[in-house]
Amino acid sequence: MPRRIDVRKVLMLGSGAIKIAEAAEFDYSGSQALKALREEGIETVLVNPNVATIQTSYKLADHVYLGPLQPWFVEKVIERERPDAILLGFGGQTALSLGVELHRRGILSRYGIRVLGTPIEGIEKALSRGKFRETMMKAGLPVPPSTPATSVEEALRAANEIGYPVIVRVSFNLGGGGSLVAWSREELERWLVRAFAFSGTGEVLVEKYLHYWKEIEYEVVRDQYGNMVAVACLENADPMGVHTGESVVIAPCQTLTDQEYQLLREASLRVAEAIGLVGEGNVQLALNPRDSWEYYVIETNPRMSRSSALASKATGYPLAYIAAKLALGYRLDELLNRVTERTCACFEPSLDYVVVKVPRWDLEKFEGVEKSIGSEMKSIGEVMAIGRNFAEALQKAIRMLDIGEPGVVAGPRYEEPESLEEVLGKLRRREPYWPIWAAKAFRLGASVEQVYEATGVDPYFLSQIREIVEVAEKLRRTKPWSSEFLDLLAEAKRLGFSDEQVALLTGTTVEKVEKARRSIGLDRPRVRQIDTLAAEWPAATNYLYMSYNAYEDDEPITTGRPRLIVLGAGVFRIGVSVEFDWGVVSFADEARRLGYEVVIVNYNPETVSTDWDISDKLYFEELTLERVIDIYWFEKPVGVIAFLGGQIANNLAKPLEERGVRLLGTPGRSVDRAENRAWFSQLLEELGIKQPSWTAASSIEEVLKFAESVGYPVLVRPSYVLSGSAMKIAWSPEELKSYIEQAARVSPRYPVVVSKFLEDAVEAEIDAVGDSRRTVGTVIEHVEPGGVHSGDSTMVIPWFSLPETAVREMIRIAETLNEVLEIKGPFNIQFLVKDGSVYVVELNLRASRSMPFTSKVTGYNLMRAAAEAALRGRISYGFNGADGFKLLRPTGWWGVKSPQPSWQRLRGAYPGLGPEMRSTGEVAALGRTLHEALLKSWLSVQGNRIPPAGSIVLIYTPTGRGSSDLSQAAKLMTEKGYTVYTIEGMEVDGAEPLPLEQALRLVRMGGVGLLMTTDYAPQRDYRVRRLAVDLGVPVVLDARLARMLAEAINRVGLENLEALELREYWGPNVEPF
């Protein structure tokens, strides 16, 4: 059937900011869907406040609205744009829940908007726990014993009837938000209130906990005529009770018999049929490891999901693209497989390789957080590795995590002295990165059975890890360079060992291991092509990986143009997110426009850059020195771009250059001078540029003497780190000693710098691109003071309180550094401004986290300028002849970027701001005034809302700092009709004080609509902040932001927030990008 012709304009809802459980996989799936719609000539309207994504650009969408994903704002967009239809399946749970709410309020019917894909009724059947259970039972599909509950009392009764242990699941949620496993009534009662706070419908499901059952997922595609295929089977190595987002996941399934595979596949197809799926859905099932015929259907997601993104990249089957086409009315057999360009979309992929996904956590950044993993997602990102066997793929995946481990064995966690009982304790508690702890347990003499009892991981996977350990320990015992050693080395390479691992195990150097490897004919791994059908049909794309388990290269397709390699950002973690992927994809576009063949190296399954049609060649590979050099010598490019991939790529710049790799852009020696804190501080002194007083930490005694001379507080900063890792403000000698030790552990090879911390300074920065003579950029002012990491700050363009003299000095410094360091690409300088003086804090000679925001607010694509600077040596874009600094300063509009925290997801963590970054994503909005842009941006952060008039607002200061701003906020909120309270001992003027216990009771009873506070003082107010975030109360954590927000609520209000398209602010003379 041809597609429906009554759809000419489609509204698509994005997923908003990157947050735990809802990350860049939706940027990828949404981008694919927009691409599919554009191919069909359909006009698209996108609502998504995530300024950092490729999706919110005119490359894909016809109309882009940065604004809150809330019904009132989306209705304003609908009123202006009048779309024919809406797509809900490509923006995660945020888009689905919002779509259901638009339907319930009658907004969709009022404007005659049709829902494409799975109908609302099907969405509700899938996402309401009670309705899903009924639907499955009606379809004759088994579900675990369970009871829906709408109150704490009902849930406790249900658990008594079912019997402990139980798992509590929340309706209309994702990432296991609010879910829990309870082994007793006391444990259940303790966390139920929090579970209900996560539920959008006030409903939870109390279900029998299936201890150590296997968790299997199928990705199902179905058209509206009932044709369907199971595109992928994903096996969770972790058992039931560990959220799939927290689990090690393998494709294809490794431990199922054919009987089990077909049984569960058939069940998955019946689930899709039962809910009326149209497009793509994920079905999760539990299989009893002791009885092949006993299984249960656990849940389904009638939308693109994290697993869908993984399945797409693992199989080469473009699930989101196909799902969007099916939503338009196509049949499966009418659509082509875009990898082979010969077979149709109704062919189920077949894999001749193994894919392993491993999550990445950043729990050490959060004080008080619960460290074990379970039914609720806490991981920030994930990696995907491809190998010819499980061991090879797993070793690659561990390296890709960028946690300082060279693989499953030989790293610091594996080598640190511990007893077997200590290691088994970590496995029982489910501490992150269990494959390393399992390997260590085997090294200490544990049996497969012992590790299985501690983890519930199938013995097959455990035996593969034990094999890695056996080879590692043999290497350790064998005389280097003997014939036995060389045989072992060949075996180790086939099991995914890196040269660094072998060197660590044998006490030799990487160079010697490499020489030995070459002597036995292993010059490099072979290049393999992903074709989706196990080589039955030739592939028409360059989707590649490398393996030592192959004897010849697949021949990639070449264009004949000069070739360059672009290094991606790797795994997402706090500080590295989709902003860097925006840079990679935007730069790749510009490089191709300038006539280059672009080869991207990256391994993040969530990203647009790892989509095989973004570049001329994609290597889904490690970003390690060994692998990048392998690719470099095979591809023979004109050079490598390392300034777009965040800290991973930046840290590779110098070692790559030392190995003869040609870096394009800013020279490696300049990068080294900027990243090494001590060297950079010396450079600033030579240039006469002010900086806070500093010293390099050569000994604790010297540092303490320095701190005494300049006075506390002081700032401790390691080198070559991102997101402020181990960056701390020390207020006493005891704190300083502790922080120096932490910083030395994070960056052991480089100096730790200690500098005077300037209290109450304004923080500002310049985002720019330079070519050594020309500089183009903008000045950004932070709302929060210096001392709050830039990634956690509210950013404003143009500046709003900086003196013009300070801005001129910042521009002068940028021009000087551009010339002196021979910059040829993007850079970012961070400043502190105090009493009119400008101090440089740091310089990053790479694309910054804020560059998508800068570009989209100003209407100037910094990546286009970066491509010209790096590849042509000269920026022409936007220049009319003269050199110097081109200042990008919007007139008539403002842009505000707000951080997206994930406090609620991180049970136990203290919500507070400081020099180490803790937010997981960002949003932005534009407005005609600063207050309009600020309010719109703040409301775009998930969980933020303006409480109804008459609600209670709690405002206090735990340290006494910020009391003036908070008092003004209290006065303004009172004027607006709110009841404002403060806390005794932490009072602010203009609010009625309450004893701490009474304030806690008020929060617990749901009486507080907004909390405003400041500073980082867990010993003073941990309970108030933690309870507020657990119960979903919006929290403002800085005094100046609280005051400005109160002004915005007073002056603007929801009714006056405009819904304008991005380019309406830019004006007609800006070329959309």
Swiss-Prot record:
Species of origin: Hyperthermus butylicus (strain DSM 5456 / JCM 9403 / PLM1-5)
Protein name, as recorded: Carbamoyl phosphate synthase large chain
Domain MGS-like residues, every copy: 944-1073
Residues at which Mg(2+) 4 binds: 842, 844
Binding of Mg(2+) 2, residues: 299, 301
GO molecular function, one term: carbamoyl-phosphate synthase (ammonia) activity
Annotated domain remarks: The large subunit is composed of 2 ATP-grasp domains that are involved in binding the 2 ATP molecules needed for carbamoyl phosphate synthesis. The N-terminal ATP-grasp domain (referred to as the carboxyphosphate synthetic component) catalyzes the ATP-dependent phosphorylation of hydrogencarbonate to carboxyphosphate and the subsequent nucleophilic attack by ammonia to form a carbamate intermediate.
Lineage of the species this protein comes from: Archaea, Thermoproteota, Thermoprotei, Desulfurococcales, Pyrodictiaceae
Cofactor: how bound: Binds 4 Mg(2+) or Mn(2+) ions per subunit.
